[in-house]
């Protein structure tokens, strides 16, 4: 018989991973080895990646917002030259798209912040949408060519450009961690005929906050950052399945975004994710015949 944790314990660990707990704190609280927690994260990440990719398609969204959120892996970019770093160490950006009506995360992508990653992100988004949408992004320049490559003229695309002043508190210690003050915005139509009243990135930015609160490795000014790029992606895959399919949203009347978007008929839970893990697990390679024990 396989030596593995029961379903309830595994579901609890997965819930803790998307409720702001670090992996070592989960190990301490549950009394489970850190290696077991790590393996469970890897298995869950792989299962959730396949499930999300196969399920979140044919979307009938009308308004979509996109944004990028910063994190880092192994070391910050400014320390990259001073450390013997593995591949993908340094700044890591997570690109996300969210349906403004159902709050569903349509797709996500992890990598750099340049034109190559913007293009791959937008091509994937276009492949998941079933109709023409109004798309809003921030003023990041790579979006311009990426949207054109992915959608052509079959989209109503606008950018919301924020204007910033100086950080409160000046350049001293008081203003070191304070964001610059937003002094205004400009709405710029790029493709098609976007409705200016609906040009917004508020839901995408609010979802960024949810990510920072839900995943410990996204919390600023801690040592809980990702040490390995693969595990960074695994926890994101788990988080987005939880956010879309398992989490009750008060703004939606207590149902999940997937239910609101019409791609799920019920509210799922982490035991469902455990079931995905077990389904994806390879069958034990037991011998078909056994030698008789010598007398």
Ranges and model annotations:
Residues 1-295:
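Residue-level recognition of single "structural anchor" positions
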């Amino acid at each position: 018989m396989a030596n593995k944790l029961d379903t309830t314990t595994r579901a609890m660990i997965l819930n803790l991973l998307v409720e702001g707990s670090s992996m070592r704190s989960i190990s301490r609280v549950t009394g489970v080895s850190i290696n077991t927690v790590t393996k469970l994260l890897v298995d869950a990440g792989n299962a959730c990646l396949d499930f999300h990719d196969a399920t979140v398609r044919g979307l009938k969204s009308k308004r979509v917002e996109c944004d990028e959120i910063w994190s880092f892996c192994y070391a910050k970019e400014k320390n990259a030259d001073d450390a013997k770093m593995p591949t993908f160490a340094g700044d890591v950006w997570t690109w996300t798209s969210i349906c403004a009506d159902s709050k569903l995360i349509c797709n996500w992508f992890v990598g750099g912040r340049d034109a190559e990653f913007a293009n791959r992100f937008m091509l994937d988004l276009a492949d998941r949408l079933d109709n023409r949408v109004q798309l809003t992004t921030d003023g990041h320049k790579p979006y311009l060519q990426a949207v054109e490559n992915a959608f052509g003229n079959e989209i109503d695309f606008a950018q919301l450009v924020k204007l910033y002043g100086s950080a409160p508190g000046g350049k001293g210690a008081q203003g070191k961690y304070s964001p610059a003050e937003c002094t205004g915005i400009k709405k710029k139509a790029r493709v098609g005929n976007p409705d200016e009243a609906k040009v917004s990135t508020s839901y995408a930015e609010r979802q960024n906050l949810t990510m920072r609160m839900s995943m410990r490795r996204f919390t600023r000014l801690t040592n809980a950052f990702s040490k390995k790029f693969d595990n960074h992606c695994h926890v994101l895959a788990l988080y987005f399945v939880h956010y879309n399919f398992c989490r009750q949203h008060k703004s939606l009347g207590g149902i999940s975004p997937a239910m609101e978007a019409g791609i799920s008929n019920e509210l799922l839970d982490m035991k469902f994710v455990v079931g995905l893990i077990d389904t994806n697990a390879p069958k034990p390679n037991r011998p078909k015949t056994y030698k008789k024990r010598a007398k």
